[in-house]
Swiss-Prot record:
Segments for region (Domain III): 139-183
Molecular function via GO: ATP binding; four-way junction DNA binding; four-way junction helicase activity
Cross-referenced SMART domains: HhH1
Organism whose genome encodes this protein: Helicobacter pylori (strain HPAG1)
Region described as Flexible linker: 139
InterPro entries reported in the protein's UniProt record: DNA_helicase_Holl-junc_RuvA_I, Hlx-hairpin-Hlx_DNA-bd_motif, NA-bd_OB-fold, RuvA, RuvA_2-like, RuvA_C, RuvA_C_sf
HAMAP family: DNA_HJ_migration_RuvA
Function: The RuvA-RuvB-RuvC complex processes Holliday junction (HJ) DNA during genetic recombination and DNA repair, while the RuvA-RuvB complex plays an important role in the rescue of blocked DNA replication forks via replication fork reversal (RFR). RuvA specifically binds to HJ cruciform DNA, conferring on it an open structure. The RuvB hexamer acts as an ATP-dependent pump, pulling dsDNA into and through the RuvAB complex. HJ branch migration allows RuvC to scan DNA until it finds its consensus sequence, where it cleaves and resolves the cruciform DNA.
Domain of life: Bacteria
Region (Domain II): 64-139
Gene3D superfamilies in alphabetical order: 5' to 3' exonuclease, C-terminal subdomain, DNA helicase RuvA subunit, C-terminal domain, Nucleic acid-binding proteins
The protein's name: Holliday junction branch migration complex subunit RuvA
Keywords of the record: Cytoplasm, DNA damage, DNA recombination, DNA repair, DNA-binding
Length: 183
C-alpha cells in the first residue's frame, strides 16, 4: 500500500498531478486547492490514500494530514465518492468545511458541484460530532474513525467520545470507548 510520495512534480492539471519518484511517474488525484499550490519541477511530499477498486487503482494526494483525514471520512458517507470528496476539498479548506458543518450551512454545501439538497443533508447528519471542538481534536477524530471502521454508528461514537477523559492517548481512548460501546 502506498501511503506517501516524495518526488518532483512533472505535470499538473486541475485535479491531477504527475509525480516522478526515482524514474516512476505516479498519477495522483488532488483537490484544486492542492493543485494550485504545486509547481512543475517542485519537490513535493504528498500524503497518499490508495483506493483499489475492481476497475481502478487510484492514488489521492494531500499536502496536509487534515485534508486526508477529512477525505477518508467523507468517503465513508453513502453517496460520496472520490469525485465529490475532492470537489468538497477543492471548494473548502478543512477548517472552512468544519465551520459549515458546525453552523449547518446546507446551502453552502449545495454549491459544491455534484451535491444536491438530499446529499448535503446526509453529509450534515453524518458529520455532526466528527469535528470536536477542543485541543485534542486530531486525536479524537482518529478515535472516531477507528471506532467507525469497527462498525459502530456515528451517534453511538459521539455519545461515548463526550464521556472520555480529555488527555487520553489515542490507544487508551479507543480501548476505553470500546469498553463503553460493548457494555
Amino acid at each position: 500500500m502506498i501511503v506517501g510520495l516524495i518526488g518532483v512534480v512533472e505535470k499538473i492539471s486541475a485535479l491531477e498531478a504527475h509525480i516522478e519518484v526515482q524514474g516512476v511517474v505516479y498519477g495522483v488525484q488532488v483537490s484544486m486547492r492542492t493543485s494550485a499550490l504545486l509547481e512543475t519541477g517542485q519537490k513535493v511530499r504528498l500524503k497518499i490514500l490508495q483506493v483499489i477498486k475492481e476497475d481502478a487503482n487510484l492514488l489521492y494526494g494531500f499536502l496536509e494530514e487534515s485534508e486526508k483525514i477529512l477525505f477518508e471520512r467523507l468517503l465513508k458517507i453513502n453517496g460520496v465518492g472520490g469525485r465529490i470528496a475532492l470537489a468538497i476539498l477543492s471548494s473548502f479548506s478543512p477548517n472552512e468545511f468544519e465551520n459549515i458543518i458546525a453552523t449547518k450551512e446546507v446551502k453552502r454545501l449545495q454549491q459544491v458541484p455534484g451535491i444536491g439538497k438530499k446529499l448535503a443533508d446526509k453529509i450534515m447528519v453524518d458529520l455532526i460530532g466528527f469535528f470536536i471542538q477542543d485541543e485534542n481534536r486530531p486525536a479524537r477524530n482518529e478515535v472516531f474513525l477507528a471506532l467507525e471502521s469497527l462498525g459502530f454508528k456515528s451517534a453511538e461514537i459521539n455519545k461515548v467520545l463526550k464521556t472520555l477523559k480529555p488527555n487520553l492517548s489515542i490507544e487508551a481512548a479507543i480501548k476505553e470507548a470500546l469498553q463503553q460501546l460493548r457494555s
